[in-house]
Amino acid sequence: MKVFVLGWLLKINLMKTLYSQRRFYHVETPFNTNVGVGGRDIESTGFAWWSGNARLINVSGKLLGAHVAHAGIMVFWTGAMTLFEVAHFVPEKPLYEQGLILIPHLATLGWGVGPGGEIFNTYPYFVVGVVHLISSAVLGFGGLYHSLIGPDTLEESFPFFGYDWRDKNKMTTILGIHLVLLGIGAFLLVIKSLFVGGVYDTWAPGGGDVRFVSNPTLNPLVIFGYVLKSPFGGDGWIVSVNNMEDLIGGHVWIGIICIAGGIWHILTKPFAWARRAFVWSGEAYLSYSLGALSIMGLTASNFVWYNNTAYPSEFYGPTGPEASQAQAFTFLVRDQRLGANVASSQGPTGLGKYLMRSPSGEIIFGGETMRFWDLRAPWVEPLRGPNGLDLNKIKNDIQPWQERRAAEYMTHAPLGSLNSVGGVATEINSVNYVSPRSWLTTSHFFLGFFLFIGHLWHAGRARAAAAGFEKGINRENEPVLSMRPLD
């Protein structure tokens, strides 16, 4: 017996959504025999329960509830995980050896940390965790209220918060509000660094300290020079930022641009070319958002792997090149104490064993680490002169804190696999651990990549719907539909 004999074809024809008709075969299951949630079931929306928020495309109040509840889940994780890290924190060990990823971010903001990146007070982290937990409860209540009790749609009762996905002016107004909020977020970091206790600067003399960034770089040639730089080699695009003045100055510019752009989008209507160029539907906006998040994730992945200014090595562990250079430096210090002439000793290839010259003539560390000759790190920069490493400083001016830090970084390279088999292959003293730098890099690459796939998927569906053709497989003439049911 064909399925449409049962009358389901009529329901299919009556199912209209913003995008296109969906065909389905009705299945009664024990848990939903008597349950029908208007506006959120397959008959009225064309989407099954596993399509998630797609069921809420045309019920703005319920979609608000889903988003607020989702925010509550995220904030709850943040608070709970912060308290978990505080409970497991061991002051005698570096943060990066304890698998912590939230306390390092809070320490970078200058809370609870002193000279050399030493954590002396975990109470601020406890406060942050509790504040997030309380906030998550408020968000959770709001999510439940709007999902279960509040109005299905906001347009009638709260026109300011209501919307139609096809209303181009309203959509750009919402975009503008989001940009203003992002700009305010950027300025919060600026305010923290300028006026509220300062931030941790790994480049502060003597091995890093909390300080006020009182003179941020505002020169647009410097700030936008990062954006226009090549992403390859030693140029490093925006990832190459190596001082707090430029980093905070960049946030000043981003804050100004986001707020100005937000006000622009709130006050104006999209131009004719923009109305023609973009697809104006809920799924299209989802695809745009996923594309933007993908760029952010992939950028963050590169940033945390290579950059030791925004992500200080005291908290996140050394970068790969930093651990390699630290190994060469550690053995230079050891053998120099034993009487080796580090300036003239040759390695097995005839190149300098401890020191050598780069192709451009600068003095660099010799051996395998020569490929990382352009590394910049706070513990090695004081030993440089006008032409690379200064031989006089190498012989007479190496400080104990530099030796200690290099030895620590040498044995904590961010090369561990997920089962904690880690370290530099040539360093028998390496510690088996997964570096937070490795973890954050790989997780953000993974998330960025799959967000990009999601962007392509939803962009393709949105464009197909806008072009007016059916998506998916036409199942009308599928043989199985004419076969006898299994039961």
UniProtKB/Swiss-Prot annotation:
The keyword Ribosomal protein does not apply. It is found in: Plastid, Chloroplast thylakoid membrane. It is a multi-pass membrane protein. Residues 1-28 form a propeptide. It comes from the Eukaryota. InterPro entries: PS_antenna-like (IPR000932), PS_II_antenna-like_sf (IPR036001), PSII_PsbC (IPR005869), PSII_PsbC_sf (IPR044900). The keyword Kinase does not apply. Binds multiple chlorophylls and provides some of the ligands for the Ca-4Mn-5O cluster of the oxygen-evolving complex. It may also provide a ligand for a Cl- that is required for oxygen evolution. PSII binds additional chlorophylls, carotenoids and specific lipids. GO terms for cellular component: chloroplast thylakoid membrane; photosystem II. One of its GO terms (molecular function) is metal ion binding. One of its GO terms (biological process) is photosynthetic electron transport in photosystem II. One of the components of the core complex of photosystem II (PSII). It binds chlorophyll and helps catalyze the primary light-induced photochemical processes of PSII. PSII is a light-driven water:plastoquinone oxidoreductase, using light energy to abstract electrons from H(2)O, generating O(2) and a proton gradient subsequently used for ATP formation. NCBIfam families: psbC. Belongs to the PsbB/PsbC family. PsbC subfamily. This is Photosystem II CP43 reaction center protein.
